[in-house]
A protein has these predicted regions:
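Feature captures the catalytic ectodomains and active-site-proximal regions of enzymes
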Residues: 1-164
Length: 164
């Protein structure tokens, strides 16, 4: 999440949106827990609420062209492609590149508290988490494991997929 000099690669998206479209866009970072020494409350995924009258497509296209952004989804697209609950996300959902993070404004993120290199959560590059199960899987779950199991599938695999 840092450049070659070790400095954080941060897109302060709410600041950039205000500069381009005026005040009123609100960026929410789901990773806003108080333990900030690794991630500075910056994330690889944010949701954006747009004020009335703003052209959603124009904003989405503009965000998509920013260095460090890999995906911009409308609420409907995020629901369908990312399985996100539509009542808990904004008008747009934005994902960053492997070595980038997204935040609101510099004032919302105190990077002086970082103790080491910047880490993050929530993006495509953090979703590949290995399953380690101490027993062999039955044939049905062994076949499922060759697909694209998600982190929350581990409970199903452990409870129902172990060979008897």
């Amino acid at each position: 999440k840092c450049n070659a000099a070790g400095e954080p690669n941060v897109i302060f998206l709410e600041t950039e949106l205000a500069r381009e479209f005026g005040e009123g866009c609100r960026v929410i970072c789901p990773i806003t827990d108080p333990y900030v020494v690794h991630h500075g409350a910056l994330g690889s995924a944010v949701t954006v609420y747009l004020p009335d009258g703003v052209d959603e497509r124009a904003v989405a296209d503009w965000i998509a062209a920013l260095d460090g952004v890999t995906e911009v989804h409308t609420r409907e697209s995020a629901m369908a492609k990312l399985e996100l609950p539509g009542d808990r996300i904004g008008d747009l959902f934005v994902l960053s590149a492997r070595d980038w993070v997204i935040g609101r404004t510099p004032e919302h993120h105190d990077l002086s508290k970082l103790e080491d290199t910047l880490r993050s959560h929530g993006g495509r590059y953090e979703e590949m988490v290995p399953f380690l199960i101490s027993e062999p899987l039955n044939s049905r779950y062994a076949a499922l494991a060759k697909g694209d199991p998600r982190n929350f599938d581990i409970f199903d695999f452990v409870c129902n997929g172990i060979q008897s």
